[in-house]
């Protein structure tokens, strides 16, 4: 297997991976986190960013519109986007001076393929599982079972403005009892946290 990596020795390529069942809001979360990163970068750089240190990789080939939507949002944010690499990720040129945001397919098998690929030692990957806060508690165990291939991940609760604090607290307790960290809460307008720096 070949990797085309433009990197210094001992550097790892930073990757943020977003997983979740169909309709969980994972792509929405990805772009909100990316926007936070861009705004933070511009604040520290006096509003200038010659080349964005970020890139979006879309593995979402299940829906024909998903890649196009991803490209359009990236154009609006002035961030490079590569869609359609789901079959040949090993042939892509990854750079250690960039951080990659990975949008995954809705199919669990495809998500596992992406996770396995970016679990290799040349990558420093951080995984986030988008979980709708409106979901029934009895279904959460099944979702965790589906994503048992994720060895180290954090949860982002989505659709928080479509439920109440009691339900959110119940879901939070569910994850806390399993020692799974909730990284952020997402609603229609904002996300209440930012990704930890790799």
Predicted regions: what they are:
Residues 29, 33, 69:
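Hydrophobic positions on the alpha1 helix immediately C-terminal to the Walker A/P-loop
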Residues 19, 41-66, 85:
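Short beta-strand-centered segment that lines the nucleotide-binding/catalytic pocket of NTP-utilizing
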Residues 22:
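The conserved Walker
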Residues 161-198:
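Canonical P-loop GTPase G-domain recognition
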Residues 1-13:
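Extreme N-terminal, non-catalytic leader segments
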Residues 25:
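Conserved glycine(s) of the Walker
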Residues 112-135:
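Inter-motif core of Ras-like GTPase G domains
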Residues 58-61, 65, 76-86, 98-114:
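Switch II (G3) loop of P-loop NTPases
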């Amino acid at each position: 297997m070949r990797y085309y990596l433009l990197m210094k020795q001992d550097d790892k390529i930073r990757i943020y991976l977003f997983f979740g069942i169909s309709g969980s809001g994972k792509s929405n979360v990805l772009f909100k986190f990316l926007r936070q990163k861009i705004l933070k970068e511009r604040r520290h750089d006096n509003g200038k960013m010659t080349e964005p240190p970020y890139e979006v990789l879309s593995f979402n080939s299940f829906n024909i519109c998903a890649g196009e939507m991803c490209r359009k949002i990236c154009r609006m944010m002035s961030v490079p986007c590569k869609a359609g690499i789901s079959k040949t990720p090993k042939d892509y040129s990854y750079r250690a001076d960039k951080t990659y945001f990975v949008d995954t397919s809705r199919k669990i098998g495809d998500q596992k393929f992406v996770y396995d690929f970016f679990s290799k030692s040349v990558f420093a990957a951080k995984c986030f599982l988008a979980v709708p806060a409106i979901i029934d508690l009895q279904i959460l165990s099944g979702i965790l079972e589906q994503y048992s291939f994720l060895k180290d991940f954090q949860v982002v609760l989505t659709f928080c403005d479509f439920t109440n604090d009691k339900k959110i607290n119940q879901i939070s307790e569910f994850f806390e009892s399993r020692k799974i960290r909730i990284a952020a809460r997402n609603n229609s307008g904002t996300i209440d946290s930012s990704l930890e720096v790799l």
